[in-house]
């Protein structure tokens, strides 16, 4: 019995250490989507945008622009090129385009707290005020080095920077970039990671083996 427990323990450790995690984003590469005005903000010419499925027209998520100099059009279909941790192919930030422009921690924090409806808890944001949406868009552009001044979003920038510079700061949100190739890349968020199927099979096999062994011992 002791030997079997040791085997199961090894399987469990391998399952957690060796296997990866899957982030269930609302869209994936090759999905076709379109944009529409969410009715919030847009005094900036940027977000907030609604993203809808081009086939069934379901609302998938709401988002904000990352690249100031690239554009999209409403009610026009776009094919998702991929989901990554950086923007590619545009913007004013003169980084190596092949390497892309990684998302800043402050941008991730702002968008995650916006999506989870936590951004108003510090009296930084009013979900019923268009000016708050415009401020958030300006803050995102500034944090991604797309504009030289955050303007009305400066207070969001400073607050987010203070948060992520704290020595005890940790971030468990799932924020990435929806890459659209030559068009405007957008922020996207997903839920907490879930184990891959291979992980579940490995763990299940170990537990099943333990149950089988115990039954044999009891006979």
State where each predicted segment sits.
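Sec/Tat signal peptide C-region and signal peptidase I cleavage site
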Residues: 18-24
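A short, hydrophobic C-terminal helix/tail in secreted or cell-surface proteins
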Residues: 195-213
